[in-house]
Every structure is written in C-alpha cells, then in structure tokens.
Amino acid sequence: MSGQEKRLMVMAGGTGGHVFPGLAVAHHLMDQGWQVRWLGTADRMEADLVPKNGIEIDFIRISGLRGKGIKAQLLAPVRIFNAWRQARAIMKRFQPDVVLGMGGYVSGPGGLAAWSLGIPVVLHEQNGIAGLTNKWLAKIAKKVMQAFPGAFPHADVVGNPVRTDVLALPLPGQRLVGRQGPIRVLVVGGSQGARVLNQTMPQVAAKLGATVTIWHQSGKGGQQTVQQAYAAAGQPQHKVTEFIDDMAAAYAWADVVVCRSGALTVSEIAAAGLPALFVPFQHKDRQQYWNALPLEKAGAAKILEQPEFTVEAVASTLASWDRETLLDMAERARGASIPDATERVAEEVSAVALAR
C-alpha cells in the first residue's frame, strides 16, 4: 500500500493533552503521503485548532457523563447510540484504513463505529492512569500504546508526542553549563492558571529574595491579581504573563519549572531536559500524580501534593537546588524522555494499516 492510498482518522478532543499529540502524529503521517481527517466535537478546542493545522474535521455530538445528573445518566445510552451512528456514517464516507484514538469523549463512539465497520482501532493513552473511554476501547483495539508505564499492564511504553520546537532545544549540558546569577524559575499553571500557584509563589519569592528570578504564567484573567500579589510581597520585579505563546523559548530560559503535571506538560519538560517541582491536580484517580512519578523516581523532579504545597515547603525545596544539582536533574529528565514518541506511534499506526 503506497503512502498516497493510506487513510487515517484521528479521534481526539477536549483538551490540549489529547489534541496536540494527535496533531503531531497526523502531521508526521501526512508528510509520508497519508490522507488524514479528524473526528471531534464542535464545542471544544479541536474545532478551531485542527482546521488551523490544515486538517479537515468531522463532528459528532457527545459529552462526558461524569458528574451529570440522573436525567443525563438515563439519556446517556441514547446519546452514545446517536453519536455512534454519526461516527459510523462519517467513517463510511471517508473509509479510513485505521483509526487512532488519542483520548477524549469522542473516541468512545468513534472507536465503536470503526470496530463495527471492521476498521482497526489503535489507541494511545497519554496519562499514567487510563481514562474510562480507553479502558473500554482497549478490549476491541488492535494495538494499545501508553505514554507512561502502568496505565495498561501489557501495552508498549512509547511516550507522548511533543512539539518539534521543544524537541529541537539544545541539550541540558549545552544550555545550562556556565549559567550564573539567580535561579530562573518558570511557573506554569496551564491556560486556566492554577490558584495554588498564583497564591503561593509570590510569598515564595519573598522568602527566596534575590536568589531567584521568576516568570509566572498566571492563566486567563489572572495577570493583574498575580502582579499585585508579587508587588504586595515586595517582589514587583518578577515577570507575570497571562499566557506563554512560545513554550519552547520559556523552557530554554528556565532552570527549573514549578507546575501541574498534566501528561503533555510532564512529557514536554522531560523532552526539554528540565528539573521540575510538580503539584498534581487533585483528581479522584490521582492521574497527575502518576504522570509525574516516573520523573521523581528518575531523580529529575519532586512532587508536592497540594496540601503539602506550602510557602515553606516550596521555598526550602527550591533553595536546596543549586546549579550543579539542577544540571544533574535536567540531564536525568532528558534521559527519561522518549524523544521519538511521534515516530513510534506513527510506526504502529502504519503497521496496523499494512496488516489489515
């Protein structure tokens, strides 16, 4: 089968942690001549982001069931059936050789539709704990991959596909050797920010004084409040931005990152070769804790769960990391990364399509 004849449908939606890895794999296969379409929902980020990346997208109507009332739970089978019918019609038109599920609600009915049409399903789990949809789909998938060990007992560990500009950063030894002056602390709470970071880090800055310089990404609507908090702590010199458009440049600037531990963030930090202080979001299944654990075990990071993320604990942790320690941690982070994750996922997709 030549590259021009191969067709892939990517199923991913909801959050950047699902969509960005899917885009990385899609672009890699498109460069090899594959035709790629996307299955998503019209009210989430993929609706805008995927077409901007030159990929046509089809929509089905589906949403999550967690935390919904009894009426929504009772209607769920009807909604899933309708979404399955929509996905099935889309796949009948496009006739993909293989579908790739990268997570999000859309993968459930999409994967079932593909299976019902005899189209092989390939799954990639980005988190250290498998999501509900992928747990179901794993039973019918031809191939299951995972970014971190432990999500599935026998799945190949292939890492998370990350952006090429992050992979292109100089290695820690080239980037960090010879740096002087205050330790550069990058604080990242995601696009929505993280209240615990926004409230705690200005006080940490006051404790550490001139030994650190901070670049703090506050999240949407948080810039002024966080700037005022730094000023009130007597630390107005630190940089606060609502968003960071060029994360690769921010990683290149930083000596250490203080952040949540979403799957993509953890994978990017490892690929960049950066030490980290992680404060996992308190999911019921502790998903972000399990994402961060491999880097802590590798000696590249420390995890402080949210109740432990106090001014004193954060300040003492950062103060204990001198430049020599940070360089060692950075090299351990890079050593724990899987920089060819995109290629690994793409190769498995190709193998399943060829074996069909």
Swiss-Prot record:
The keyword rRNA-binding does not apply. It is found in: Cell inner membrane. Keywords: Cell cycle, Cell division, Cell inner membrane, Cell membrane, Cell shape, Cell wall biogenesis/degradation, Glycosyltransferase, Membrane, Peptidoglycan synthesis, Transferase. The gene is murG. One of its GO terms (biological process) is cell division. One of its GO terms (cellular component) is plasma membrane. CDD domains: GT28_MurG (cd03785). NCBIfam families: murG (TIGR01133). It catalyses: di-trans,octa-cis-undecaprenyl diphospho-N-acetyl-alpha-D-muramoyl-L-alanyl-D-glutamyl-meso-2,6-diaminopimeloyl-D-alanyl-D-alanine + UDP-N-acetyl-alpha-D-glucosamine = di-trans,octa-cis-undecaprenyl diphospho-[N-acetyl-alpha-D-glucosaminyl-(1->4)]-N-acetyl-alpha-D-muramoyl-L-alanyl-D-glutamyl-meso-2,6-diaminopimeloyl-D-alanyl-D-alanine + UDP + H(+). This is UDP-N-acetylglucosamine--N-acetylmuramyl-(pentapeptide) pyrophosphoryl-undecaprenol N-acetylglucosamine transferase. PANTHER family: GLYCOSYLTRANSFERASE (PTHR21015:SF22), UDP-N-ACETYLGLUCOSAMINE--N-ACETYLMURAMYL-(PENTAPEPTIDE) PYROPHOSPHORYL-UNDECAPRENOL N-ACETYLGLUCOSAMINE TRANSFERASE 1 (PTHR21015). UDP-N-acetyl-alpha-D-glucosamine binds at residues 15-17, 127, 163, 191, 244, 263-268, 288. Its EC number is 2.4.1.227.
